[in-house]
Amino acid sequence: MNILFFGPNGSGKGTQGAILKEKYSLPHIESGAIFRENISKGTELGAKAKEYIDRGDLVPDDITIPMILDRLQQDDCKKGWLLDGFPRNKVQAETLDATLKKANMALDIVVEIELDREIAKNRIMGRRLCVNDNNHPNNIFIDAIKPDGDKCRVCGGELKTRSDDQDEAAIDKRHNIYYDTETGTLAAAYYFRDLAAKGGSLKYITLDGAPGVKEVAAELVSKL
């Protein structure tokens, strides 16, 4: 089962991915982690990516997509994978789709978690990250996942706050990219939605991200 996740920052996308990872024993692959791994290992692609990152530039697709494909072809992905954080625009979606097909790798399910921008922003400003696992849900504004004081509600680990999670301008910038249906991340999601509508094996699932973590997870599992 190969699954691609879409959702704005604050939608709980990472949390839902972590739940599916545990339930189905699938690797949860985040594009940022792929960059960090390649750079730390000193791979040829990692070295090229680092040059762009150090300049503050976006890493081009001809570097990013081969990295992602290499990760998806590793042994732990043979029974399936969850990909999160890529693609971020329609061109990347088209390129990823063509690359997977060329590699004889099927994309089975695309999940889009929908959430109002204002709700998403409030969630971001209230979230706290566990030093042991960023996907442990802790949010000072949501009763169901409020942390245990200054400790993670899941494992008791130390909590930290990302500086850009408290920067409204930075949050708005991220959301502007995501919610743009012409050139942004939603344009990538809708590319796959349109593919699924044409028939074939690809399934496109939309979820309301407003309810609690357990409710969203239950709906997601029921639709898979």
Curated annotation (Swiss-Prot):
Pathway: Purine metabolism; AMP biosynthesis via salvage pathway; AMP from ADP: step 1/1. Its EC number is 2.7.4.3. PROSITE patterns: ADENYLATE_KINASE. Residues 126-165 are annotated as: LID. AMP binds at S31, R36, D57, L58, V59, G85, F86, P87, R88, Q92, R162, R174. InterPro entries: Adenyl_kin_sub, Adenylat/UMP-CMP_kin, Adenylat_kinase_CS, P-loop_NTPase. ATP binds at G10, S11, G12, K13, G14, T15, R127, P211. It is an enzyme of class 2 (transferase). Residues 30-59 are annotated as: NMP. It is found in: Cytoplasm. One of its GO terms (biological process) is AMP salvage. Keywords: ATP-binding, Cytoplasm, Kinase, Nucleotide biosynthesis, Nucleotide-binding, Transferase. HAMAP family: Adenylate_kinase_Adk. Consists of three domains, a large central CORE domain and two small peripheral domains, NMPbind and LID, which undergo movements during catalysis. The LID domain closes over the site of phosphoryl transfer upon ATP binding. Assembling and dissambling the active center during each catalytic cycle provides an effective means to prevent ATP hydrolysis. Catalyzes the reversible transfer of the terminal phosphate group between ATP and AMP. Plays an important role in cellular energy homeostasis and in adenine nucleotide metabolism. Belongs to the adenylate kinase family. This is Adenylate kinase. It comes from Desulfosudis oleivorans (strain DSM 6200 / JCM 39069 / Hxd3).
